[in-house]
């Protein structure tokens, strides 16, 4: 496993410990990708996992671009349409460094 895959696994475990239910991972379309799909009761949570080994250049919290946000939103819309679902949903970010994890809920 590479560091990105390990970070996604760690993020999944962390979110499950917080009471979320795992739905899917690494959902890819030509126009975007979703790292994790979780559920928190009736809310579907699309999670982008960002890992940085240091805080140099702003660390994990500053690693998400507006282009990536657009691509994640498109992928989530497509996923829900393919599943014929229309649930309440939100977009979270798990920002991880070597020594900490930050869970930002509903951040875009």
UniProtKB/Swiss-Prot annotation:
Stored Pfam families: UPF0102
GO terms, molecular function: nucleic acid binding
Superkingdom per UniProt: Bacteria
Coiled coil start-end: none
Family under the similarity heading: Belongs to the UPF0102 family.
Descriptive protein name: UPF0102 protein Sfri_0388
């Amino acid at each position: 496993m590479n560091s990105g895959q390990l970070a996604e696994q760690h993020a999944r475990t962390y979110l499950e410990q917080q009471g979320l239910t795992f739905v899917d991972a690494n959902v890819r379309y030509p126009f975007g990708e979703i790292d994790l799909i979780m559920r928190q009761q009736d809310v579907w949570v699309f999670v982008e996992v960002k890992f940085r080994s240091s805080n140099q250049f702003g660390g994990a919290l500053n690693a998400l671009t507006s282009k990536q946000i657009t691509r994640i939103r498109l992928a989530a819309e497509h996923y829900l349409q393919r599943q014929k679902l229309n649930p309440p949903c939100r977009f979270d970010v798990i920002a991880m460094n070597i020594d900490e994890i930050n869970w930002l809920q509903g951040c875009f």
